[in-house]
Amino acid sequence: MHTLHWWAVQAVDKEDAAAIVESVVSEEYVDWSDWYVVGGGRWSNSQYENSHDMVISYDEEPEKFKETIRGCIQARMDEMTFIKDKIDINKFVNSVEKYANFGTIGDDRFGLQTYYVRKAGTMLLEYYNPDSYFYDIIHHSASTDYIYELIDKKDSNGLFLVPVDFHY
């Protein structure tokens, strides 16, 4: 499955922003992906090659920058709504009680309750994951709050959003 994520970074220009993201992605951050293209991948004209074509500069396009982040937030909200609808609290609590009492969850071991609760927890803790859609290199966080703080403080010089097509 492919997912488009937007990485926030401070850089000199679009090329520098894409290069910084490429360096960080390749070195350390993404343990859930087996393949990626910086620059948008299948969402761009450079499907298999790293590029800076889709990079968004806050200085040049502040509304598009903020709209893109809002899109990431909406995608998270949609994912959480899907997860919420899948979680059956009674089944989950029953599994917890069985495990606490017997060391196993019994017949529910192939159910997806714990999977969805784990996904919800990962998102609520703002751990970077396939459903984050956004990552802030500057603050090492999947939270969008810090970027908005920079914008609010008028400290947005050299802010860029770099698209990354991840496969997982």
Residues covered by each model-derived region:
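Alpha-helix capping and helix-coil boundary motifs
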Residues: 12-17, 61, 88, 143
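Low-complexity, serine/threonine/proline-enriched polar segments
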Residues: 26-134
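Acidic, proline/glycine-rich low-complexity IDRs
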Residues: 1-3, 125-168
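Short, extreme N-terminal segment that most often corresponds to the first beta-strand
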Residues: 1-40, 157-168
